[in-house]
């Protein structure tokens, strides 16, 4: 049964409420950016500041906006969607709901504003996957069955270099890499090397991970190192920095309204697995582009067949496509990042919900809450 917006207001909206854990998250200190920030593992009191200033906390390269952005309309009056109740219960820095090119609601907490660029965490992985698809469409990548070393010669003879691009896209390289977010695992070691600038950049950063525990394509194991290699593949195939390629082939054709930024490693390579910063509205524009099969106003930006493949189950784990999470309901997909970053997309209704946040690490609380909230939104807008 369709739930009307008026009924939904009565059920789940109770007016603006205080954001959770404001003091613990640094309100009395002005939500600062702390010295020696440790990325998403920074102390709680400076998480809000760090997660909305990644592009200045760590070395970065600008992704330039076009001269004219894609216009977005705004619903007037704003429909009742239950955002205030959701925000009062979850540590979101921002939340935006859009259907088609119309923003239905947009909220910020913890003194964040529309101009803040929010760190993607692993949402960046989907951006990299789309750049792979664009490069494939341009024939700069001949085939995703090519080994990565064809485009990254420094990985010749290494298990990652011998892995077909296809299996890097689906996180099925079979190379051992521990990613459990305990502050001591392989992803933290990689982050220290390339994001915190403590080690080598480029291919040298992944050379320590040499043990193959399964043949490519057989075992799904989430590993940020595989996306880092994919970003190197795009750079090698195109002859451009990932930032310049993102600017020219995605951000400007998409019609972003603000500059974005990629963080870079000590060798100047973009940290493709975690570190793309953009405004909420531009994350929403990206979601709309994907909802429309990679086209803007009917003009292809990302090949449609690539978007379809990337957002459909591709791995032994059925909830994963090409660096993109696929709902078990299979009528939607999402970009997801640590601490509550997410862009949910429902192509049939062109509905996009963007979350940024400073959620606690551990468990699947954020994903479950966001999935349930997305269901509420879909019912409200008339799915």
Show where each model-derived region lies.
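Active-site SXXK
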Residues: 101, 119-144, 168, 230-234, ...
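A short acidic/small-residue loop/turn micro-motif
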Residues: 109-113, 117, 359-361
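Bacterial N-terminal signal peptides
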Residues: 6-14
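Active-site helix/loop module of the DD-peptidase/beta-lactamase fold
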Residues: 119, 138-178, 209, 236-274, ...
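Active-site Gly/Thr loop motif
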Residues: 257-260, 306-352
């Amino acid at each position: 049964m369709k739930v009307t917006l008026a009924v939904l207001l009565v059920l789940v909206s109770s007016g603006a409420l205080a954001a959770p854990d404001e003091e613990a998250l640094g309100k009395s200190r002005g939500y600062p950016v702390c010295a020696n920030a440790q990325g998403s593992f920074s102390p709680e009191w400076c998480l809000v500041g760090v997660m909305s200033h990644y592009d200045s906390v760590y070395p970065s390269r600008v992704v330039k906006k076009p001269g004219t952005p894609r216009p977005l309309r705004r619903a007037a009056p704003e429909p009742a969607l239950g955002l205030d109740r959701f925000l009062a219960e979850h540590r979101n820095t921002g939340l935006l709901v859009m259907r088609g090119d119309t923003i239905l609601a947009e909220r910020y907490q913890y003194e964040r504003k529309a101009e803040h660029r929010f760190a993607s965490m692993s949402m960046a992985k989907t951006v990299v996957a789309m750049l792979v698809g664009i490069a494939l469409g341009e024939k700069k990548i001949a085939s995703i069955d090519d080994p990565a070393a064809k485009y990254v010669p420094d990985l010749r003879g290494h298990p990652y270099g011998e892995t077909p691009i296809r299996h890097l896209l689906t996180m099925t390289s079979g190379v051992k890499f521990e990613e459990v977010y305990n502050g001591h695992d392989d992803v933290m070691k990689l982050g220290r090397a390339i994001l915190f600038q403590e080690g080598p950049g480029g291919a040298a950063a992944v050379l320590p991970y040499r043990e193959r525990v399964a043949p490519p394509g057989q075992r799904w194991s989430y590993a940020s190192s595989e996306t880092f290699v994919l970003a190197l593949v795009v750079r090698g195939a195109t002859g451009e920095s990932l930032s310049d390629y993102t600017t020219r082939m995605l951000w400007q054709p998409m019609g972003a309204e603000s500059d974005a930024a990629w963080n870079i490693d000590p060798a100047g390579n973009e940290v493709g697995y975690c570190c793309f910063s953009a405004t909420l509205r531009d994350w929403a524009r990206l979601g709309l582009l994907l909802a429309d099969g990679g086209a803007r106003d009917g003009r292809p930006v990302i090949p449609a067949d690539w978007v379809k493949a990337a957002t459909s189950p591709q791995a032994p784990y059925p909830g994963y496509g090409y660096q993109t999470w696929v709902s078990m309901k299979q009528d939607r997909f999402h970009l997801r990042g640590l601490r509550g970053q997410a862009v949910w997309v429902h192509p049939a209704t062109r509905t996009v919900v963007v979350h940024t946040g400073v959620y606690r690490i551990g468990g699947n609380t954020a994903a479950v809450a966001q999935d349930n909230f997305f269901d509420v939104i879909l019912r409200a807008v008339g799915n």
